[in-house]
Amino acid sequence: MRSVIADSRRLVVKVGSSLVTNDGRGLDHAAIGRWAAQIAALRAQGKEVVLVSSGAIAEGMQRLGWTKRPREIDELQAAAAVGQMGLAQVYESRFAEHSIQTAQILLTHADLADRERYLNARSTLLTLLRLGVVPIINENDTVVTDEIKFGDNDTLGALVANLIEGDALVILTDQQGLFTADPRKDLTATLVQQADAGALELEAMAGGAGSSLGRGGMLTKILAAKRAAHSGANTVIASGREADVLSRLASGEAIGTQLIARTARMAARKQWMADHLQVRGHVVIDDGAVEKLTEGGKSLLPIGIVGVQGAFARGEVIACLSAAGREVARGLTNYSSAETKLIQRRPSGEIESVLGYMLEPELIHRDNLVLV
């Protein structure tokens, strides 16, 4: 089996906290130097590389003299602000040894949820790559809260892969890859060498929390691979402890787990809707509606809705759930949650008589709907 990285021209490489820090005691300058050297080698092969790097909070903790990761959001934000300075400085100096310019880009999910800012970020990144610069990206933890509590750079790496239409996402971690079960508890667990990025069984194999320094466990990596596949990007999850792992992957050596994007690449606008807009609520749909959405490519009509969850407004993104609770699709709703409750299970011809008006005959038009 040949590594998909060998034939990939544009890469997003995500490096976790444990691979750039001294077990939380500040940044590991030597390790960062090795990553810079490997990325420089990829550049020499004609590959474009965007680096998503953790480590800012760990570095900030070291500089502030903290030995434990704080729980308070404002303290995490302070650590991120202090640490981001050091992280950028070390990367800049290490890449300079290879005559490579770097650029620091701090993003939040809100940046990518706004269509204009999304396109601006895309334009900037593509320009930097054209100029031969290595963009170094991290979440802007100093101005957000949800990302610190629940976010992770695995997800950010996938979103960046979508943003720049990367060929592959490389997630480097302190684990060998995805196993069929937790190898610490099950001696029969084996490494999954290759699978479809959208395979449902992968989520069952994954799970568990990450380290005390990082935020992402294996499940976040599987979900990141699924997101990256929306833009046609393959994903490799591999151990950053492997010597020269990036160079070996680029040479064709199969290391870790390869998750292949089997589905057709989404149209750019639908990809943006699927991955960058926050879901504000849910509707439960009947089996007939599931079939029409997944097999017929139809719009979602009110008659197929059997339940409404959460509060949402017209124009927001909602998820469509099967009766079993599995997300089938998501899209931009034409009606609010209050309106949807009134028109659910009714044919479109009755919308006006119930509400006094009819905005659209569909709850979600197929042009604004994405299968997941």
Curated annotation (Swiss-Prot):
Belongs to the glutamate 5-kinase family. Pathway: Amino-acid biosynthesis; L-proline biosynthesis; L-glutamate 5-semialdehyde from L-glutamate: step 1/2. Its main location: cytoplasm. The keyword Ion transport does not apply. InterPro entries: AceGlu_kinase-like_sf (IPR036393), Asp/Glu/Uridylate_kinase (IPR001048), G5K_ProB (IPR041739), Glu/AcGlu_kinase (IPR001057), Glu_5kinase (IPR011529), Glu_5kinase/COase_Synthase (IPR005715), Glutamate_5-kinase_CS (IPR019797), PUA (IPR002478). It is found in: Cytoplasm. GO terms for biological process: L-proline biosynthetic process. Its EC number is 2.7.2.11. The keyword Zinc does not apply. Substrate binds at residues 54, 141, 153. This is Glutamate 5-kinase. It comes from Paraburkholderia phytofirmans (strain DSM 17436 / LMG 22146 / PsJN) (Burkholderia phytofirmans). HAMAP family: ProB (MF_00456). The gene is proB. ATP binds at residues 14, 173-174. One of its GO terms (cellular component) is cytosol.
